[in-house]
Amino acid sequence: MTVTVLATLARVYVDDLDVALPTFVELTGEQPRLRFTYRDLDLASVGGYLLLAGSREALAPYRGTHATTIVESIDQVLRLVEEHGGELLDGPNEVPTGRNLTVRHPGGATIEYVQFHAAARATLA
């Protein structure tokens, strides 16, 4: 079973998104493709990075997640977990960019998977 991966973003946890963004814009030479609020977090994707900003308390539940992977289908990820093991930690959930879930895979890697809705998916082009 193969999961169709559209992109993988390195997660960077920051105190203040407005302070952090200029550095990542300069680093990547790109403007933020997405910027949104989810729960108590401010998020933006710039180049290959997903910046997550919030208080120490707000970020605490997310710090153990190693990457965000954009996939064609959340259902493919669920089948992968069923076939290869792993633990569904959260989701599937409706989020501002589509649907997500978080999985701890055998070996310990914890990955957030997101299936973008059409508007968010257009930012990948």
Regions found by a protein language model. Name each.
Residues 18-19, 41, 75-76:
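Short alpha-helical
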Residues 20-25, 81, 108:
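Conserved active-site tyrosine of GNAT-family acetyltransferases
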Residues 1-3, 7-15, 57-125:
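Vicinal oxygen chelate
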Residues 30-64, 110-117:
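Conserved short beta-strand elements that form part of the metal-binding/catalytic scaffold
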Residues 26-33, 85-87:
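Conserved acetyl-CoA-binding loop of GNAT-fold acetyltransferases
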